[in-house]
Regions:
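Active-site helical microenvironments for divalent-metal-assisted chemistry
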Residues: 1-160
Length: 160
């Protein structure tokens, strides 16, 4: 993962965190990445964590196959694991990491929040819902042409 910085009117790429494990064909090595995260922070249930990664990856693949990505060339799964990587470096708990991995799938309305609640529990669903509410509040106070954290108009109406 790299972030752009501007120095003397020139854009440079700066590495901001360690890359995640990849397979030979350029896909995320979920097992390797789970092990990498487990070496950085405590995972209460590595199987649940792995399942969240697999679910997010499958949802992302379906979006790609249906040409329904949120932006050309984007991967909601990879962005989700990058967010989870940041949270792992901050030593947040597993529920927070799982919520980060799954957030974009819910935000992009590829999976209902209720499905996440059933499969991953109230805490994960509550965290995702809370982030959606914060994004909606931010949008109300600072309206932009684009979405903030991907909230939809319906989410804004719910907060109002």
């Amino acid at each position: 993962m790299a972030a752009a910085t501007i120095r003397n009117n020139k854009t440079d790429m700066v590495k901001v965190r360690e890359d995640y494990a990849m397979t030979g064909d350029g896909q995320v090595d979920i097992e390797g990445w789970v092990n990498q995260i487990a070496s950085q922070t405590h995972l209460d249930d590595a199987d649940q964590f792995r399942l969240a990664c697999e679910k997010a990856a499958e949802i992302d693949l379906q979006a790609f196959r249906q040409d329904r990505q949120w932006a050309p060339g984007s991967s909601s799964f990879r962005i989700g694991i990058e967010m989870a990587q940041v949270l792992a470096e901050l030593h947040l708990d597993q529920a927070s990491l799982v919520a980060a991995i799954l957030y974009r799938a819910v935000r992009e309305e590829r999976v209902p929040l209720e499905t996440i609640r059933k499969e991953f529990g109230d805490e994960v669903a509550g965290l995702i819902n809370g982030v959606q509410q914060m994004a909606a509040i931010s949008s109300i106070h600072h309206p932009l042409k684009g979405n903030v954290l991907g909230q939809s108009e319906g989410q804004l109406d719910n907060v109002r």
